[in-house]
Amino acid sequence: MINITRVEYCRFSLKGRLRLLDLFGELVFEKITPNREMGVFKLNDFYVAVIKDLEMNSVIEASPLWTVDQLQFYFSQ
């Protein structure tokens, strides 16, 4: 396990963020729609939302969730 904070995680490039999730993240939620794939990962004591555009086959975002409301939003989609 890696000891990293949300702020430290934000300093990494998108490629670095995804690598950290590959190595140390735990997938807790995943949803696939016709155009997008959304995943929520747990990394240490915070969650990270990853959004992938399936048409372009590229990751759009890998950002930490700062509030419980954001986490609930992803689970309710």
Mark where each language-model region is.
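Polybasic/polar functional segments that serve as interface/processing modules
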Residues: 1-77
